[in-house]
């Protein structure tokens, strides 16, 4: 799903606060303490929500991918993504933390992933020695909520604002499994500007790094290409052939009656409404990337 350019310029999205460098160093040290690494991804943007630095940081540690927020993602594409990651050698779990769907499969999946280590513990008479798993993910992929559900607690502060979970903490899941939570970490530069855009669509980067209208223009053009039925159902909009993102935003605003004096469309209001609708799930189950994009 390669997004076509609109006639509105793409802004260069960068967000790498100073604490990110410190966080990376901390993770590089702490990964030595664990048996495996669990990476939480947003099922709507599995490429964009993967930190490309994590592979280098984790080395040869066994890995698990959690495709989170499957309630907001296209089920057919989620299935494709799960198969894609399995063929790459990852254990894969699909979750919706709001309804706890998939959560019960986590501990069994970890034990399967680390079955050889458990067998070695048994051979050494270390039955009961806990497995240690590091949980990583970029800001706002639902990592804290995931950990809360796994551990059955409300201890890891979850907030819909990028970068809110700080510090290091071990969480006891049961007597045989400890989780090491880590702060959300981005990477210094988005090599592909589309990655930055997709992170901005879902709210994984702060809103002040890109103009909302510019973001909405690119997003509505993407909807017109891959999910035209969503535009029709939600905004009563049939996208004219060849219309760019700004024109589509104006048409949607007109349909909504978002007008200012003189009959001009309030595109700023429409842009905010569009992005709010997407982030709250009102546009339905939409996935913005497919495994074919990795080829």
Regions found by a protein language model. Name each.
Residues 1-36, 44-53, 57-63, 76, ...:
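Helix-rich effector regions associated with P-loop NTPase G domains
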Residues 41-44, 70, 150, 183:
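Anionic group-transfer/hydrolysis microenvironments
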Residues 52-55, 79-82, 107-109, 148-151, ...:
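Short, glycine/charged-enriched secondary-structure capping and boundary segments
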Residues 64, 70-136, 155, 257-259, ...:
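Canonical P-loop GTPase G-domain recognition
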Residues 97, 147, 177-180:
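Conserved active-site beta-strand-loop modules that form the wall/rim of enzyme catalytic pockets
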Residues 105, 109, 145, 218, ...:
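Alpha-helical scaffold segments in soluble metabolic enzymes
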Residues 117-121, 148, 154-160, 226-231:
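Short, structured loop/turn "capping" segments at alpha-beta junctions
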Residues 132-152, 156, 182:
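Glycine-rich phosphate-binding P-loop
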